[in-house]
From Swiss-Prot:
Protein name: Beta-chimaerin
Species annotation: Mus musculus
Segments crossing the lipid bilayer: none
ZnF (Phorbol-ester/DAG-type) intervals: 78-128
Residue ranges constituting the Rho-GAP domain according to the UniProt record: 141-332
Site entry: Arginine finger: 177
Gene name, Swiss-Prot/TrEMBL: Chn2
Membrane disposition: Peripheral membrane protein
Subcellular location(s) of the protein: Membrane
Keyword Metal-binding belongs to the record: yes
């Protein structure tokens, strides 16, 4: 064997040694962490130890990503736990204890995949970071879930649609009041569900701007929890009933502070946009009152599904949206 071949063979052996040392070190560190021995007599423990470590790694990686990602928008989100039957051995990612049983051993978050005991789920903090692989669609998806999954301030549908409307539609007569073709609006919805932020809603595909406004309104209507949440609905209605304008404005501002951060940011962005719409009233014939009529029932829904309540509250819904538009620079 020539000297060059001997040198290459020696380097290969050295590389194998260097590779094995960190592996051995990792075994020792894991063993210390879990309180077991991995010497000559304890080597047989390495396989179950590795299995246990792997069962914990997804949780560790997820929490590390949350800690170190500076661009992450700090919106709190509760976990969406559902009873789950696990195949094979699983450990609780909260208490690190084994999940006993053959069926329904614990619960799994359907948004991020966190696995915990049912009793432990009551103590898990609101730190759900949804996994994009688990988000099947954009429409009908919880707003906070969507923005956390995509790590954005607002839902992509809102950003993309408003950007398109402001680029070519602010002077369109009856903007938001005139409806586009329903089947074309459904096409836009399917495009967002299928392609996400890559959805093409340009004038080349949808020349009628009313299709884009219709798709935006449909997104808000399809939210499982409205922009103005069920928890704050009655408080907004009560604020709208206050006769004194200054006191009413103050009351509305106080209730706004109760909205979840993602809802607040989306509502703020929408109101800034609608204010721009009213600034083109001479062309589009849409003032704050007209937009309030359109967006009141779209952004606000009573907690109880009552037609009578909805009809009774319509004027207050309109007034709330009108106030938000006219005073967006003060309220937000």
């Amino acid at each position: 064997m020539c000297s060059q071949e001997l040198w290459l063979e020696n380097e290969r052996k050295c590389a194998m040694v260097r590779k094995s040392k960190p592996s051995r070190k990792r075994q020792e560190l894991l063993a210390i962490a879990f309180g077991v021995k991995v010497g000559l007599k304890g080597g047989f423990l390495w396989s179950p130890l590795k299995l246990f470590a792997c069962s914990q790694i997804s949780s560790l990686v997820r929490r590390a990503a949350l800690t170190h990602n500076d661009n992450h928008f700090n919106y709190e989100k509760t976990h969406n736990f559902k009873v789950h039957t696990f195949r094979g051995p699983h450990w609780c990612e909260y208490c690190a204890n084994f999940m006993w049983g053959l069926i329904a051993q614990g619960v799994r978050c359907s948004d991020c995949g966190l696995n915990v005991h049912k009793q432990c789920s009551k103590h898990v903090p609101n730190d759900c970071q949804p996994d994009l692989k688990r988000i099947k669609k954009v429409y009908c998806c919880d707003l906070t879930t969507l923005v956390k999954a995509h790590n954005t301030q607002r839902p992509m549908v809102v950003d993309i649609c408003i950007r398109e409307i402001e680029a070519r539609g602010l002077k369109s007569e009856g903007l938001y009041r005139v409806s586009g073709f329903t089947e074309h609006i459904e096409d836009v919805k399917m495009a967002f569900d299928r392609d996400g932020e890559k959805a093409d809603i340009s004038a080349n595909i949808y020349p009628d701007i009313n299709i884009i406004t219709g798709a935006l309104k449909l997104y808000f209507r399809d939210l499982p929890i409205p922009i103005i949440t069920y928890d704050t609905y009655s408080k907004f209605i009560e604020a709208a009933k206050i006769s004194n304008a200054d006191e009413r404005l103050e009351a509305v501002h106080e209730v706004l502070m109760l909205l979840p951060p993602a809802h607040y940011e989306t509502l703020r962005y929408l109101m800034i946009h609608l204010k721009k719409v009213t600034m083109n009233e001479k062309d589009n014939l849409m003032n704050a009152e007209n937009l309030g009529i359109v967006f009141g029932p779209t952004l606000m829904r009573p907690p109880e599904d009552s037609t009578l309540t909805t009809l009774h509250d319509m004027r207050y819904q309109k007034l709330i949206v009108q106030i938000l538009i006219e005073n967006e620079d003060v309220l937000f």
